[in-house]
Amino acid sequence: MKIITVTLAPNQAVLTCYLQDQSPKMPNAAIRPAMLVVPGGGYQYCSDREGEPVALAYMAQGFNAFVLRYTADATTPIDKALQDGAAAMDYLRANAAELEIDPQQIAAVGFSAGGHLVASLGTLLPQRPCVGLCRNAGRNVDRRWPPGARPARAG
């Protein structure tokens, strides 16, 4: 396994990349599906238990996995986290060959606030993942948008 850490603009979010080792005995597995893991934490922090352990579980299923530590603290509006999610998706697609992933097979899984972020990525921005899985998606997060900045709901 190879681990790469990338800092994403504009908010200095951190994307940790967990990449499978290539095996000459498995030439058809050179390009893998990707799973973007978005931990919860109430938009106040990113939970460690919903990051690397989840990424490793997806790696065991054949994915290359990526954990997004988005901008999160008590004073930051969630639009910054949404920017971080978009930056992560842009990075994955732009660097798909280097990361040995299929840009048409990028899924995202999020927990709690991370689930809300994945759902928001899937409905509000063009940088959406191919598939989004949300677990215990956050409630009462509308209050975190700055005045006048909350995007319109899709559909």
Regions found by a protein language model. Give the residues of each.
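N-terminal cap/lid segment of alpha/beta-hydrolase-fold proteins
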Residues: M1-A30
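Primarily recognizes the serine-hydrolase "nucleophile elbow" in alpha/beta-hydrolase
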Residues: A87-G155
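Alpha/beta-hydrolase active-site loop signature
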Residues: G42, Y70-A74, N140
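Short amphipathic alpha-helix adjacent to the substrate-entry channel of hydrolases
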Residues: A29, S47-F66
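Catalytic nucleophile-loop/oxyanion-hole region of alpha/beta-hydrolase
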Residues: S47-D48, L68-P103
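Residues at secondary-structure transition points
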Residues: Y45-R49, P53, T76-Q83, A108, ...
